[in-house]
Amino acid sequence: MAATSGNGQEPMDTSSSLLDLEAYLTNYTGVTRARRLAFIASVSPPHKRDALALAAAEVKRTTNTALYLELVALSGDDGGLSRDDGWVEQVDRKAQQRLDKLESDLNGHKTSLVKESIRMGHTDLGDFHYERGDFNTALKCYVRTRDYCTTSKHIIAMCLNVIKASIQMGNFTHVTNYITKAESTPDGSDPTLLAQLRVAAGLAFLEAKKYKLAARKFLDVPPELGSSYSEVASAQDVALYGGLCALASFDRAELKAKLIDAPGFKTFLELYPQVREAAHDFFQSRYASCLAHLEKLRPDLLLDLHLHDHVKQLYDDVRSKALVQYFSPFVTVDMRLMATAFNVGVDGLEKELAKLIMDKQIAARIDSQAKVLHARHADQRTATFAAALKMGDEYMRDTKAMLLRINLMRADFIVKGEGQGIGPSKSSRQEARATAPFHPAGIDGLMAMEGP
């Protein structure tokens, strides 16, 4: 059974996913638990009923009635979720009372002009709206605390609050801006803080489809992250996002240095052994095994809140890289053997190779009759001579330009503004003639352009 991704574009086959929802939830805290379950329910019919039940139970521990009503609407007739109007009315009434108190307290703090109290008042209001699921209002409250921050710790707390609200909204421009602000504060070098900021930066680059930059951020996350950022992403997510983006974008040397042999990231890879095995298989040129590992992961990855829109592109990039890397050492390749190595049919492989050739990722031509791929290697000797001639021409041009400049300077020859004449004065000419100019025609030759 297939569903459609959150952006309505990518078909998502999640029927073979064996995701244990209750075990999955243990990796997260806060509002992201219910939001991830709601997303799973929206894209995976096989998981819809269980995900909705867990999400509704999770939401009822909070004051987020808006998300609860979304879950009820998503449930429809077959989701098994009925609307609890009594709970909604009770929570909304209590929430309004708390909101009135928070706003009253904030007004009192503004009257007293105590900056710390005003900052805390805005933060409490932001936390209230964040729990209610009104991330836009929460963001505005968090941003207002900026004018009342008196220490670097206050600035960092403000930045982290803005970042988490912006991530929930999908506003990654704000995320990037406030990451930079947090990193520039005096206390911005704390390992746990750096870990959280790098995770947020990785998510921003992932959303922008800048997979290489995303991989570098995720792979630079220190082990101190632990579960400190589970309201946004888990340590398992770091291993998954970082490993997959690295496989899709890193070259062989960078993959080994920054992923496979990186001592800091090994801690994360231990949490996701399938990604570790896929990376090792890719580096060891066991491409069929690597791609098989990734295919087993695909159904679960399509259920991920942040990764789902990128799975197809990332997988295509990994496969293209594998094909290019397999072919690169050879002059000719038997496509039948290559098809066996990639566990694919020859006709299908030929179409993939043709696309890579058209995209100029492989310099080769296909012999469809013999099923052989021939490399198109450039004539290195001709290329070397051409480069040498080009360098010589550039040297001659630069030398002539320098000689001309020297002669002009010796002649005191300048171009002045309109109406002020051209060239040096008579005395300057006489002085120039007393020197030994480089110009083969002499100074008079240079001055000939002046006229009498």
Per-range role (PLM):
Residues 1-155, 160, 164-452:
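Charged, E/D/K/R/S-rich low-complexity terminal regions of large eukaryotic assembly subunits
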